[in-house]
């Protein structure tokens, strides 16, 4: 692409040599581990308390991505629903706001003006028309949130690497066989149901476990 080598002589790409990268292992938290996080006695207003709120809100709303969480504004919340446009694919999403999310929102509602209209304060003061500045702020915030999530994991005695993105995997893990793949596709806003099936395959293991037991339990 940079003109360093003629495309005809470039050995990689479509219909040529293709490098296959190993599948990443997706690990989500269990229901018990989420409960442990929920039940932590954290000081109101502390970094850990705030980080837990951001992470749980993401999880409660079907694992919405960190950029979408941090860019959520109060004006996006109307009639008991969150309506926003996904950063990744620009699809419009409308989700009912669960009671647990309403509780989190109540902590931040008094600061809506101070936070520049955002639910969370990470993007206050950032020029939203400057996409590079917004992206940089989100990356920095994500790094900070992940740092405090490590502390939360330690406090909750969870031996897993918890990150903001793990909230999405956690939703997938807990939803398991509880929700149809068609409904999960809508919640995730995947373009193809195949994408949803492949994603959930990382977490749904009951059928495999039952099949294994059926063979060796004699």
Q: Where would I find each of the regions flagged by the language model?
A:
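N-terminal DNA-binding recognition helix of tyrosine site-specific recombinases/integrases
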Residues: 1-11, 62
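Long, amphipathic, Lys/Arg-enriched alpha-helical "connector/arm" segment
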Residues: 19-50
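Active-site/catalytic core of tyrosine-dependent DNA strand-transfer enzymes
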Residues: 33-34, 98-159
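Short, basic (Lys/Arg/His-rich) helix/loop patches that form interaction surfaces
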Residues: 39, 43-46, 146-186
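Short, polar N-cap/turn motifs at the start of nucleic acid-interacting alpha helices
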Residues: 75-81, 158-160, 179-198
